[in-house]
Each structure stands twice: as structure tokens, then as C-alpha cells.
Amino acid sequence: MLASPPPMSAKTKSKPVSRAALAGEADPRLVALSVSIQDDGALYAEDIRGSQAHVTMLAEQGIVPKASARRIVAALDQVRAEFAAGKIRLDPALEDVHTHVERRLGELVGADAGYLHAGRSRNDQVALDERLFIVAACERCDAALGRLQRALVARAREHEKTILPGYTHLQRAQPVSLAHHLLAHVEAFARDRDRLADVRRRAAVSPLGSGALAGTTLPLDREATAKALGLAGVTQNSLDAVSDRDSAIELLFACALAAVHLSRVGEEIVLWTTKEFGFMTLADAFATGSSLMPQKKNPDVGELARGRAGRAIGDLVALLAIVKSLPLSYNRDMQEDKRPLIGGPDALVLTADAVGGAIETATFHADRMEEALGSGEALATDAAEYLVERGVPFREAHEAVGKAAAFSSAEGRPLAKLTADEWRRFHPAFQKDVLRCFDARKSLARRELTGAPGPRQVARQLARWEKALAKERR
């Protein structure tokens, strides 16, 4: 049997649905505390999309008249357009985006608007809105990280043969190619993208039909609604469905870790653009000046990438703290999840695109990078492995080269400039050909294990990434 809609008039100042059983109006201080439209207003498109799928299903199930459902769907299209155009005046008295949508719908279709909420609670409604938002946010973040990867791979291709010191503890350690270094960041962002795909998969189920916490007696077709929304299935426990914020937390974790990876790139931009390093010059479009010092060219893009990581971590911790120890099922605390959830993905996209633009347009100084290898310390490990190849235990070889490095430092001469006779003072297995260890290009050419910085390995990795990223664009 078709339900009759409750009376609704656009001219009547209606009491909020949540106060139907309460006397009088809410205290203004409670109203001010309860308002969330400044945060959840960003979910208007998801809220409308969910409502359209829900009312269409209600009509197919014979719960509401099909003509009324069609009018509601068409009117919701108009409401969406009005939100997008900024024509909906946000009223704190209406608290949230759901009430704003319903109020405007009532103005457009009158009493038919009362059909919309049949078989649905705010609890499963907002849970759906968030899931739809999370699915789309994962896709936006993934696309931004993909663009950044393409920028890194393109610059790596240009610098296959550029050599620089690799660092540990920010001290020169061993030589690597700039291509290998840039591809290291590509790998980190690939893991971020894998995490986002996992988050999307778990988020893409519909909680509609869970009601406030115990479902509904109405004959809903939950699977049909999920299919209409492009979701993979439905949640399996109504209590869990309305109290679950795992996908939001997982998304913010994925964003936070990606932001940490971006902060590492940002830190390198800051370091490499200093006069002390001189490895890199930012394009003027990605740098700023000083209000006082006219000579300054500041790497703000790198610094902001570092700073945004702190905000991303804070968003994650905030949401974890909000849901900590909450009893089943829904609690109003959860209203506070909107600000970190909605702002986090957008911040990641903005940062990734800015860092990608900086990488695309920067100048890398190959001569300065190779100059930083000149003293030979970065090839000391090769000298130790020279002894290992001649049967010397590694610890013994390590000690011998360490003593040679100390001697080199005391003499004020580069390690690469020691003579074969001087090397033999530290171990008899050193021969004249030990001097070949101090050619950085030959050193890299001997490092061809899978994942190593040898030229053939780097070429393989470049080809692999170029193929994978090109496939995404088709």
C-alpha cells in the first residue's frame, strides 16, 4: 500500500524533525553548537544523489507513487544546480545539509517531499553521503598522485646518466643516479595509490536500509539502491553500518601518509635549492621573494608541502579521537568528522599538484651533483667490497677501509687520491687496481641487482613506469 505524505507547506516554519516529540524550540546556544552546514554543506551532491536513488527504489517497491518519485528526482536536480551556483542561502537554523535539501525540495514539490525519507534515517543517510564522498575522494587523490608520478618519471628519463651522492643521515653515502633517486619517490606514491584503492573498495558499499540502527519494516530493495549508486554491495549489519567510520579514518590515514611522502620531496626541494647544495633551481613561478631582502628566492612550495603534512596528521588524529570509545551505534560526536574528512583529500590534491608542477619546471644541476662525488668518500664501500671479492671477511675489509678513510682525512687528501702503496698499508690484499673503485660510473655499472641503481636496472624501471602510467591515461 502506498504511504500518504505528511502535510508540508513551504509557508509554514516547520519544527526540525528531530524535535517532533519535544516541547518548544531548542535553546539558541544548543542550536549554535549543533550547526554543521559550514562543514557538511560540501556533501550536497552526495546527499542529493543518495536521495534520488532512494526515492526511485521506493517507487519501484510500491512504497511511494512513481509520479511523485519522478517529481522529487527532477526537483533534486534543480536543488543540486542551485547549490552548485551558490543560490542556496545557508541558514544556521536548519543545522545541516540534509535539512537544507529537504526544505528546498518542499518549496519545489510541496507535500510530495514528505515521501522522501520513508525507510531512511539521518544515520544511514549521512553514512551513505560519507561513503560516496570517500569513493570520489579516493579517485581524486589517486589521479593527483598519478600526475605527480608522471612528472617524476619524465624528469627521471631526462637524467638517467646524472649521478649524485645518495645520503644517509644527510651525509654523503654512495653514488646513485638522479633517475634512481626520483623513481624512489615514484615507488612511495605507488604504495599510497594502492592504499587509496583499498580504501575505495571497502567504502563502496551502501548502508541505506540500516535506518537509525535496526533497519525498517518497509520492503526496501537495498541491493537495487546500491547498484543505482555504482556501489559494489550493501553493509551486512545495521548497527555497524551507522556507527562505522573506518573508511573515513582509512582515507585520512592514506592522505596523511601520502602527505608525509610529499613532505620528503618538499624537504629535498628546500635542501637542494640552497647555495650549500646547489643541486636544483626552482622556476620563478614556483618560488617567492622576500618583503625585505630583494635577493631572496624562497622554496615555499617545498616548505608548504612539509607543513601540510602536519595538518594531514592532525586530521587523522582528530578523527581517531572523535570515534574513540563511542558505544554502538550512532552518537552525535560523529558530526565532528566532517571537517577533517572533507578538507583532507582536497589538501592532498592541491599539494601533490603543486609539487608536481615544481618538479616539472625545475632545473637540475648535473655538474654540481657530480662535483659532490669528487672526494671519493661515497665510494668507500666499493673499496671494502673489493677486498671481499678477494676472500677477505667483510668486517675485516670494513675496518681496513675505515682506517684508510681516517688517514685520508688526517692527510687532507681525498680518498680517491691515495696511492696503491698507501692502500696496501691498511691491507695486503689491496692491489694497484683498487684505484678503479673510485670511478662512480663504473661503480653504478656493477650494481645491477633487481632494484639497484645500475644503468640497466634503472632503464628497466623507467620503462616499467612509463608503460604503467601511459596505460592509465588510455
From Swiss-Prot:
Q: Which organism is it from?
A: Anaeromyxobacter sp. (strain Fw109-5)
Q: Which NCBIfam families match?
A: argH (TIGR00838)
Q: Which residues cross the membrane?
A: none
Keyword terms of this UniProt record: Amino-acid biosynthesis, Arginine biosynthesis, Cytoplasm, Lyase
| Official protein name in the record | Argininosuccinate lyase
Q: Which family does it belong to?
A: Belongs to the lyase 1 family. Argininosuccinate lyase subfamily.
Domain of life where this protein originates: Bacteria
Enzyme Commission code(s) on record:
4.3.2.1
GO molecular function per UniProt: argininosuccinate lyase activity
Metabolic or biological pathway: Amino-acid biosynthesis; L-arginine biosynthesis; L-arginine from L-ornithine and carbamoyl phosphate: step 3/3
Catalyzed reaction equations: 2-(N(omega)-L-arginino)succinate = fumarate + L-arginine
Where does this protein reside within or beyond the cell? Cytoplasm
Which is an annotated Pfam family here?
Lyase_1
What are the GO BP annotations of this UniProt entry?
arginine biosynthetic process via ornithine; L-arginine biosynthetic process
